[in-house]
Amino acid sequence: MTQTNGRFLCVMVCAVLALAGCGHELKVTRVDAGVVTDLSGRWNDTDSRMVAEAMVKEALQYPWLGNFSQAKGRQPVVVVGTVVNNSHEHISVQTFITDLERELTNSQKVTFVAGKGERDEVRTERKEQAVYASEETQKAPGKEIGADYMMKGTIATILDEADGTKAVFYQVDLQMIDLENNTKVWYGQKKIKKVVEKKRTVF
């Protein structure tokens, strides 16, 4: 074998080894939905669920709930309004709203009614029933239950990053607003701070 051929063979072997080292093995592990999987440091399903649980629990412990029930002799009717994403991330706000709705409904302390999008769909169904459904099964309009309070709020972030380390600060603000007089009967705030470090691999 000539010296030139030997060098060529050596280069080819190194190239093959390098390509083999670039391969990625895909591994998928099925885990319980309740398990915390914080891979990127971004807002995730665990954050959404835990914040919704904590904030609804806090809201329902404040005096407005007891005061209303005592004055009216019934549970207050609550609807969830908009939650605005003011963060630097793409956050599934609808997932968070759904978590809030679940916690409010399952608390059995308030009567929960459908939000605007759902109401529009149901109203369309009633209109179609008036045309296509039999008279004895039609649902008449004008019998909806109006909400007494609306829960709405914002999600914001503050980002700090240096030398491969990133700190993300999430702040969720929610308010319970009396729909009759616009007074805010509860204001809650939940904060989450995450530190994400990028590990450098030395070959």
What residue ranges belong to the model's regions?
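Phosphate/oxyanion-binding active-site loops and adjacent basic polyanion-contact surfaces
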Residues: N44-V56
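Amphipathic beta-strand/beta-sheet edge segments enriched in Tyr/Trp
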Residues: G23-V28, D148-V196, R200
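Bacterial Sec signal peptide processing site at the extreme N-terminus
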Residues: A18-R42, V202-F203
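N-terminal segment of the mature soluble domain
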Residues: E53-A54, E58-Y132, N181-Y187
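Short, surface-exposed secondary-structure junctions/capping segments
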Residues: V131, K198-F203
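Sec-dependent bacterial lipoprotein signal peptides
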Residues: M1-C22
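Second-shell loop/turn segments in exported
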Residues: T37-T46, V83-I91
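A short, hydrophobic beta-strand-centered structural micro-motif
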Residues: A54-A59, V77-V83, Y132-E161
